């Protein structure tokens, strides 16, 4: 599991160069990160290392990551945000 300091670093990494990604990724981190499995947390952190244009494409559903862990995490992020609209 992540220490408080490590979580703070992950939260900082959630801040992207695109507001559109901030609006999608930050709430997921705040509301879901603690409940993810260790493998899912690692996939989330790894996902944050991807370039913003790629993340935006995946989140918008215009493409899919070749990395299965990233694709699965994007699905979780999108589903979380869609569930808030229902």
From Swiss-Prot:
Pfam families, per database record: Sdh5
GO terms for biological process, alphabetical: succinate metabolic process
GO CC, one annotated term: cytoplasm
Subcellular location as annotated: Cytoplasm
Highest taxon listed in the record's lineage: Bacteria
Keyword field: Chaperone, Cytoplasm
Function: An FAD assembly protein, which accelerates covalent attachment of the cofactor into other proteins. Plays an essential role in the assembly of succinate dehydrogenase (SDH, respiratory complex II), an enzyme complex that is a component of both the tricarboxylic acid cycle and the electron transport chain, and which couples the oxidation of succinate to fumarate with the reduction of ubiquinone (coenzyme Q) to ubiquinol. Required for flavinylation (covalent attachment of FAD) of the flavoprotein subunit SdhA of SDH and other flavinylated proteins as well.
Similarity comment: Belongs to the SdhE FAD assembly factor family.
Name of the protein in its database record: FAD assembly factor SdhE
Gene designation per UniProt: sdhE
